Amino acid sequence: MGTENQGYPNFPARPASSPFASAPPPGIPPQSGGPPTGSEAVGFRPFTPSASQPTRPFTASGPPPAPPVGTMRPGQPSPFVSQIPGSRPPPPSSNSFPSPAYGPPGGAPFQRFPSPPFPTTQNPPQGPPPPQTLAGHLSPPMSLRPQQPMAPVAMGPPPQSTTSGLPGANAYPPATDYHMPARPGFQQSMPPVTPSYPGVGGSQPSFPGYPSKQVLQAPTPFQTSQGPPGPPPVSSYPPHTGGFAQRPNMAAQQNLHPNYAPPPSNVQGLTEDFNSLSLSSIPGSLEPGLDHKSFPRPLDGDVEPNSFAEMYPMNCHSRYLRLTTSAIPNSQSLASRWHLPLGAVVCPLAETPEGEEVPLIDFGSTGIIRCRRCRTYVNPFVTFTDSGRKWRCNICSMLNDVPGEYFSHLDATGRRMDMDQRPELTKGSVEIIAPTEYMVRPPMPPIYFFLIDVSISATKSGMLEVVAQTIKSCLDNLPGYPRTQIGFITYDSTLHFYNMKSSLSQPQMMVVSDLDDIFVPLPDDLLVNLSESRTVVDAFLDSLPLMFQDNFNVESAFGPALRAAFMVMNQLGGKLLIFQNSLPSLGAGRLKLRGDDPRVYGTDKEYALRVAEDPFYKQMAADCTKFQIGINVYAFSDKYTDIASLGTLAKYTGGQVYYYPGFQSSVHGDKLRHELARDLTRETAWEAVMRIRCGKGIRFSSYHGNFMLRSTDLLALPAVDCDKAYAMQLSLEETLLTSQTVYFQVALLYTASCGERRIRVHTSVAPVVTDLGEMYRQADTGSIVSLYARLAIEKSLSAKLDDARNAIQQKIVKALKEYRNLHAVQHRLGSRLVYPESLKFLPLYGLAITKSTPLLGGPADTSLDERCAAGFTMMALPVKKLLKLLYPNLFRVDEWLLKPSAAHDDFKDVLRRLPLAAESLDSRGLYIYDDGFRLVLWFGRMLSPDIAKNLLGVDFAADLSRVTFQEQENGMSKKLMRLVKKLRESDPSYHPMCFLVRQGEQPREGFLLLRNLIEDQMGGSSGYVDWILQLHRQVQQN
């Protein structure tokens, strides 16, 4: 097929571009180093701190007064705060509360120690005393100004290990085998999990490779960066009632946490352009403690970067192209200090909101305007010179002629007079109609070919009936009418071909039993035009479930059937949809029952379980890609099916894997119907290739996702749609970049379903900087996490799971250590974990990646098929969907359901995300867990019976595993169903199944919800607190 570069077998080497001035460091006026090229006439502006990164000199002038001897150290907890987790509990009194549920088995109480007397001092403590603390609601910790250290007080042994969680629930036992959906959307066996909320001191298993240590809590604030004074924080403390005057609170004056302590006097004039977690020591303990409630959490979801929206308004939207940092390093040495991924995530066909559609451009007889040297498409960043007769390429600086039909005069500023009528010169994203020279054959029609397993498991589970009904219901909505073509092959131990010629009234079935030498009968009548043979196709789909309802064949000749489908499709290409119910057992591609062998895990051969066993599958994928055949795999078996091998077909053809373990039409039917219908009816780009170009001195060195790499930088995508994203890493080819900006252009050449050959073009620009701090400030957590997840999954295919998880942790440690070194000279960092505002969620997302299904635990935590299916899915997800899967939504809905319903439901009140921790759950509440692939309704044990009865009907008191969630005839149930519908419609690419679970129903509660509370410790993996402590310890190591 054609490529973008007609007449040019490979792109030429990118020539030298005009020199540009290097970007100055933030806060220093840029020095002129020559005129820049491109439409941007100014160089990179110094970074202006946003509201989230305020900077302001300290208000105090001069050194602070020397504190009197005998006062407390800054790290000591205030005697007023005696109920902070990990500190000494108060002696028993009338105000003591029972420990929370999910506590230690047997209900062992906390070990209690006497409180020390308040040290003698003439100065009052800073800040008013907190109110009494209720169980589960901790008061913010407090600290004092820096004072002379006092002799440590012997505190005795630390408190006994405890766990905490929800009222009234016990630690759930390990499960055996339950076929519930795993994340994402896969059903998973219940692992042995011992819940323990990390906010409470306890003996916790550490991250693999690190010793288990006692983690205690201390009053340590989440240190915010300084900034201009804002509204004073609302305090929950009562007025101070002591008999002495209260000192002014410096932290309140600067809108900081009350625990804030000023740096030494010699740096009073400096600002802290970073965030930090302040880690202090508990007296009598060698471990630091943390206030887990102040940890950063992405409760607002993914926030797309817009730091350069004003400077570069013509950049394409970040939904199409997201760089890991919007500041490109100017040298290899600077790039080597950036330990985070340097690259981008591209989603070329991302869905656009109404009113923001990509403009369609037809250059007509003029031909597409491209650079003669680097083949860049004309875009908003090219410049016109010589009175409009020449234009300069923004990527290679080549001076090109302007065709006569495209000529326009320039105004006094050098701007074309017809600029407003040229979307390609004002929009960062455009779609261009390609002329015939971009085709090596006529555009292919949309082709849908179905390869369906009809063995006994397919018929008994109801899969065959659901698939046939769904295909028939979508025939009128298949893209490309009236050019669309369709065909079918079914198989068990033999192959069944179907002649659907339009002249027939009923389809003719032809059976081929020779699996070694495949013979395709009537090849011209197996793939037919849908509009011409619609009657025959309808008759076939109506009769398909009945044809095999009494089939007891258990064999699967999948390999021969795949070869037969390839032989039918290789003339035109198209989309091949495979429905597989069992392990391939006959003919080519026959697979063994590998399963999960516990003896292999932890050895050098462990990764072999997660890659294709037979090279047949990768070779077939390569052949299909060559002939423009994209493959989507639907797998259904509750037994081992070897998704690692089957998924290879989707991986290298730009497709995706759908996994329904233990499929039963009564349970999973709706999910299959919606996802298959979405696959069939969404707009698809056929026979596509994608290339991303960038300026001189840099190149994209590696690509990650579902595709076949045709050359060093050309991605072959037989079928691509809006639900596919691709990640890539960037490297510097030159020691020093001389340009002031770097340009990126993504070009997707494809055939639209209507038969037009089109080119989707996205162009963006980023400044080149000399300051590592600026790279951190302009970092995009979403893009970094997307690359990290793909790299970790790929590493798990060549190394142990422990190695893949440790690699994530080490990358984050190196990045935080390098960032700490930037500020270690100017600021006394002490025991603070320092990080930029832009990366405040990176540690939590890193933890979530290590707990995701592809990397989770070992063989007892998830099945091999579930692990591999999740990996194939995550490799193709766009940024927003991946972040939601890693840190799902948790909402409380019972209070909202009790409110009177308005004419139009306002979901803002209910869609307030909660931290993913057991502490967020109240036994009196009703919660919804949503990761984009499933919905879990968690009914607290003490939830009002009226609410449960309204939502569940007469079965409200029964075992919820046997209750079907459906709408009841009352307003509360209808209101909840509207909310569920809204959550499903927010992302139509997958259809989340809805599961009901009641508090204490084990092991379902542990599997469906508790094990997915990322911030809690589970099954040997770290909780959020322990993870932060591990990062901090390693960052401080030399």
From Swiss-Prot:
Record's compositionally biased regions (Pro residues): 22-33
Region of interest called Disordered, as start-end residue ranges on this chain: 1-247
Protein name as catalogued: Protein transport protein SEC24 A
UniProt note on tissues of expression: Mainly expressed in pollen, leaves, inflorescences, roots and stems, and, to a lower extent, in cotyledons, petioles and hypocotyls.
A family per Pfam: Sec23_trunk
GO cellular component terms given for this protein: COPII vesicle coat; cytosol; endoplasmic reticulum membrane; Golgi apparatus; Golgi membrane
Region (Zinc finger-like): 371-396
Function: Essential protein. Component of the coat protein complex II (COPII), that covers ER-derived vesicles involved in transport from the endoplasmic reticulum to the Golgi apparatus. COPII is composed of at least five proteins: the SEC23/24 complex, the SEC13/31 complex, and the protein SAR1. Acts in the cytoplasm to promote the transport of secretory, plasma membrane, and vacuolar proteins from the endoplasmic reticulum to the Golgi complex. Involved in maintaining the dynamic identity of organelles of the early secretory pathway.
Originating species: Arabidopsis thaliana
Main location: membrane
Gene null: resulting phenotype: Lethal in homozygotes. Non-Mendelian segregation of the mutant allele sec24a-1 due to defective male gametophytes (pollen grains) leading to a male-specific transmission defect. In the missense recessive mutant sec24A (G92 mutation), altered endoplasmic reticulum (ER) structure with an abnormal distribution of critical component at ER export sites, thus leading to the partial accumulation of Golgi membrane proteins and a soluble secretory marker in globular structures composed of a mass of convoluted ER tubules that maintain a connection with the bulk ER.
Keyword DNA damage recorded: no
Binding site for Zn(2+): 371, 374, 393, 396
Similarity comment: Belongs to the SEC23/SEC24 family. SEC24 subfamily.
Subcellular location: Cytoplasmic vesicle, COPII-coated vesicle membrane; Endoplasmic reticulum membrane; Golgi apparatus membrane; Cytoplasm, Cytosol
Subunit composition and interactions: Component of the coat protein complex II (COPII), composed of at least five proteins: the Sec23/24 complex, the Sec13/31 complex and Sar1. Interacts with SEC221, SEC23E/SEC23A, SEC23B, SEC23G/SEC23C and SEC23F/SEC23D.
Entry membrane topology: Peripheral membrane protein
One annotated GO molecular function: zinc ion binding
